[in-house]
Amino acid sequence: GVYAEWIQANLAIPNAEYGKLAKAFNPVFFDAEEWVKLAKDCGMKYFVVTSKHHDGFAMFHSKVDKYNVVDATPFGRDVIGEIAEACYKHGLKMGLYYSQDLDWHHPDGGGYLSNHIPSQGVTWDNSWDFPDAANKNFDRCFNEKIYPQVEEILRNYGELCLIWFDMPMTLKEHQSRALFDAIKKYQPDCLINSRLGNGAYDYVSLGDNEIPDSMPENTEFDPAL
């Protein structure tokens, strides 16, 4: 990972240290309406924002894990909730990114299997805090955090146009299918990208920063830019 959001993995920052940043996170001038109006003025039809990335920190008020923007920061406001309200007010569709496999805050977060070869020396899982890969069990992470949080975002933030998943490295087929089915249960019109994994998707997401030379035939797709 060469992106800013990968800094915890790139530098192997322990959760105890990385988590201190949350205690200093207080963007008091954050204005969801300003963001949404700018997006709409630029001609955007929908707005996708990160609800949880690989570091495991939720930008919504999660009852599943207190490592979230409401409970773990002095800011204390539900960012996703405010963006959702602004989107509905200004007629912009909203989608959410959610990291359903990698989670560096959970001891059993994905990316630890033997075939998950480090990229440029950076491991996919949190091997600096939780080095015992042999005893990791992604099922615990999925059941304790991933699935319940996906249910939260489906049930608590109104109509979503899509869920943008990422990095399906450890998910079993039945887990991908469980998430797919939950989305269709709570939000029948919500689209699901192919990075949910195991063939459970509505449309294809290309590789990061990949722009095809020509339009793929017979498939709906989006570039990950």
For the regions a protein language model found, what residue spans apply to each?
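Mature catalytic domains of secreted/periplasmic carbohydrate-active enzymes
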Residues: 1-225
